[in-house]
Amino acid sequence: MATLANIAATRAQNDSQTGYNFLRLPVSAHAAALGGDNISVIDDDEALMFSNPALLSSVTDKSLNLNYMSYMQGSKVASAAFNKTFGERATAAVSASYIDYGKMKETDESNVQTGEFSAKDISIAGYFSYLLTDRLSGGVSAKFITSYIADYNSIAVGVDLGLNYYDPDREWSLSLALKNLGGELKAYDEDYNRLPFDMQIGASKRFTNMP
């Protein structure tokens, strides 16, 4: 029997100062069960690369990952990912994630309903990870992000950077991730939003023979 302990620290911008906060949501049930944004767990699960691109190095070649979840009332989250290894050290992957917020009431200035509208967010990304040493891996992802609210659309691009150190003998994993570096290319209006930048440090330790 093994028990997994996780420690994480994060520095993030205030949500009111940013857009595209759906990028912080977990894309799989496994990620949600680990706290929503775990950057240091070593597992053969492609969905973990959404949190830290360096974790792609631990995923089996030619893995296909599909996820679908309900999130809050009327919202749906879906993601898909596929990876390919190159030699013994390099791995590349592509992914797409999608959140549909469902139908919402459209009202006029007098709060009289005039119809309905929908909103959704989409992110398409490419990933590359590389084993720098037998225990240290680095990763980068580049994301194209678009958001729709009724007839309005915005577009942004972002980059994630990650490092992971894994000691298989002691089963210690240490990670650093810089997430959502980038900005908006097209805004809904004249006000441009920043991406929800996160700087995260995490550690995981697997304990055996514990009750």
Label each residue range with its predicted role.
Residues 1-2, 176:
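Accessible peptide chain termini
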Residues 2-10:
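C-terminal segment of classical bacterial N-terminal signal peptides
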Residues 10-35, 39-41, 61-64, 69, ...:
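Outer-membrane beta-barrel porins/channels
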Residues 46-58:
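N-terminal periplasmic accessory domains that precede
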